[in-house]
């Protein structure tokens, strides 16, 4: 289930639009998650990963960044990641068309609160079970969600560093992993060459032995 949707400007974390599931409908207090979302917005910058999943216990945040705007959704952890990102892509397409040019000029929080109407309509589409089955088949062109960075929301917020730093560490780990694989391949090649050289030396010595002692 989609429980919370927020849109914010990356440059300063200013909330532009939001839609929250009513507490009595969801049976959960979403204020804590809304607070975490606002903290996250303040940590984003131009170097932050443009696609990210943040685990929050039984819930999961997903976000995308497009044209300097962050589109974030809070879902139950069991909600399919592919659908969550397809939902965010739909919001981006409509929001950018309606308000994209105005985003850099606004200074008041929730200047586009009327966008909630479209959010609610789109959310119902993704929650409906039959629609979800259809969406699951038509969104095959969505980027590989398995490659999207995954982190823990509490660790990101408590670490006190920008999300870009976390992304940098992930890239460093990827580089180290690649270097390790290259080094391992090089060592395997050296080992193979050493074995071949040993075999060659054996046969040369055998030929020399036969030639000088038996001929």
Curated annotation (Swiss-Prot):
Ranges in the Cytoplasmic compartment?
1-194
Matches recorded under SMART domains: Longin (SM01270)
Q: Where in the cell is it found?
A: Endoplasmic reticulum membrane; Endoplasmic reticulum-Golgi intermediate compartment membrane; Golgi apparatus, cis-Golgi network membrane; Golgi apparatus, trans-Golgi network membrane
Q: Which PROSITE patterns match?
A: LONGIN (PS50859), V_SNARE (PS50892)
List of residues that carry Phosphoserine: 137, 164, 168, 174, 177
Record domain v-SNARE coiled-coil homology: where: 134-194
* GO CC terms: COPI-coated vesicle; endoplasmic reticulum membrane; endoplasmic reticulum-Golgi intermediate compartment membrane; ER to Golgi transport vesicle membrane; Golgi membrane; melanosome; SNARE complex; synaptic vesicle
Q: Which family does it belong to?
A: Belongs to the synaptobrevin family.
Function of this protein?
SNARE involved in targeting and fusion of ER-derived transport vesicles with the Golgi complex as well as Golgi-derived retrograde transport vesicles with the ER.
Partners and quaternary state?
Interacts with STX17. Component of two distinct SNARE complexes consisting of STX5, GOSR2/BOS1, BET1 and SEC22B or STX18, USE1L, BNIP1/SEC20L and SEC22B. YKT6 can probably replace SEC22B as subunit of either complex. Interacts with the COPII Sec23/24 complex composed of SEC23A and SEC24A; recruits SEC22B into COPII-coated vesicles to allow its transport from the endoplasmic reticulum to the Golgi. Interacts with BET1.
* Annotated protein name in UniProt: Vesicle-trafficking protein SEC22b
**What organism is recorded for this protein?**
Mus musculus
């Amino acid at each position: 289930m989609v429980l919370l949707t927020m849109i914010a400007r990356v440059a300063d974390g200013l909330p532009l639009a939001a839609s929250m599931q009513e507490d009595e409908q969801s049976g959960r207090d979403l204020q804590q998650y809304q607070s975490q979302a606002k903290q996250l917005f303040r940590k984003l910058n131009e170097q932050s990963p443009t696609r990210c999943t943040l685990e929050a216990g039984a819930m999961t945040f997903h976000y995308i960044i497009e044209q300097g705007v962050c589109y974030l959704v809070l879902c139950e952890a069991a909600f399919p990641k592919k659908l969550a990102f397809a939902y965010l892509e739909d919001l981006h397409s409509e929001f950018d068309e309606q308000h994209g040019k105005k985003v850099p000029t606004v200074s008041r929080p929730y200047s586009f609160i009327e966008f909630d109407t479209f959010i609610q309509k789109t959310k119902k589409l993704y929650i409906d079970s039959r629609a979800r089955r259809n969406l699951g088949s038509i969104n095959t062109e969505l980027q590989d969600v398995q490659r999207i960075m995954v982190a823990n929301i509490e660790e990101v917020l408590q670490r006190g560093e920008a999300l870009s730093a976390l992304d940098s560490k992930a890239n460093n780990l990827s580089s180290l992993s690649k270097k390790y694989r290259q080094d391992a391949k090089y060592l395997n090649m050296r080992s193979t060459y050493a074995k071949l050289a040993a075999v060659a030396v054996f046969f040369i010595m055998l030929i020399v032995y036969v030639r000088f002692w038996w001929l």
